[in-house]
Amino acid sequence: MARQTEQSLRSAAVKTLTTGSFLFHGLEQEPLFQALDDQTLVTEKLYSNRPVYTAFRPQTWLEHLYVVVDGGPVIMRSTPLDRVTAITYPGGCFGMRNLSVGFGTVARAFPSLVEAYKTTDVIKVPGAVVQTLYEQNAEFRHRYALLFELREKFQYHLLNCSTYPPQAVAALLRALVYQERNLGSQPKGPKTEYWFDLPIDLIARACQLNHRTVEQVLKGLTKAGYLKPNKASDSTHDLVQVVDPEGLKAVYGATRDKVSWWPLK
């Protein structure tokens, strides 16, 4: 019975990876997946506001790639400004820039803390498995490279956050829309709407704004029709629903005299 339970858990982990993650989607027929033993894939719960690891330590590499399957987001933040520089939602991965696989050997930066902003369920995939798939599967190799590209483009959006609050918040939202669209996580269904678990504190730390200013910008974006107001219940309090992602481009490129709804001129 114990053996059957372990086998079931392993099969569930493989199924979750191959159906619910961008990187491993559709790879269930790979011989490597079919040959995984019971101890290879590690399912783990990361608790909120607890460090997972410190990224980019000199001559230090991770042993696993982390695949987010539920909860989150997981963030990376810089020192000393404590600015959020990466946000990962379910379906995405983190840790690839700290694995000695592909571009990971050259994607170095200064030490940065990685933590679960909210409780997160992950599957840890051994680096050896990632390396083998990278060498043997062209589609996997393409997706793996795209993960690095999306990280760079996310940070590029953040570099374009100006001191003008509407533009700064729009830059973050555009970064998330671009990231999740390319990962295939959103939008779901015929509507081009994007849902993000995005607390005000997280927006403030990513855009270098104070909390009150972020609240006012979100109200303005909602009144202008870019966002949809959520219900006041606790379960949806942190959800930001983008209903006009293309319209956000105008705010992203705006200067002070171009956003009529912002009261602070």
Briefly describe each language-model feature range.
Residues 1-54, 92-93, 99-102:
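Cyclic nucleotide-binding regulatory module and flanking cytosolic helices
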Residues 38-42, 50-65, 81-84, 109-110:
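A short beta-loop-beta micro-motif enriched in histidine and acidic residues
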Residues 41-46, 71-77, 121-122:
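Short beta-strand segments in beta-sandwich/barrel cores
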Residues 63-81, 89-92:
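Glycine- and acidic-residue-biased ligand/ion/polar-headgroup-sensing regions
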Residues 73, 130-133, 248:
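A generic structural signal for short hydrophobic patches within well-formed alpha-helices
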Residues 86-149:
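Cyclic-nucleotide recognition modules
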Residues 141-208:
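Polybasic "coupling" helices that flank or enter modular domains
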Residues 179-265:
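Phosphate-/nucleic-acid-contacting segments
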